[in-house]
UniProtKB/Swiss-Prot annotation:
This is Antitoxin Rv0298. It comes from Mycobacterium tuberculosis (strain ATCC 25618 / H37Rv). The lineage of its organism: Bacteria, Bacillati, Actinomycetota, Actinomycetes, Mycobacteriales. GO terms for biological process: positive regulation of growth; regulation of DNA-templated transcription. InterPro entries: CopG (IPR002145). Antitoxin component of a type II toxin-antitoxin (TA) system. Upon expression in M.smegmatis neutralizes the effect of cognate toxin Rv0299. Pfam families: RHH_1 (PF01402). Keywords: Toxin-antitoxin system. It comes from the Bacteria.
Amino acid sequence: MTKEKISVTVDAAVLAAIDADARAAGLNRSEMIEQALRNEHLRVALRDYTAKTVPALDIDAYAQRVYQANRAAGS
């Protein structure tokens, strides 16, 4: 994968926490920040996906039907 250089300004306390977390995970600072950015991207993508698909699935109605079927069957 091609890497791009970026420049960011980060609070010193945040940077110290990132460095400690990176050491604990066996990563360097750049790897830790890249991982954090990737995780945030995936979190946002999942949030957007579920905001669009979950209502369409009407999972609450499905759960209610399953619950009622189980009660009717004596489960």
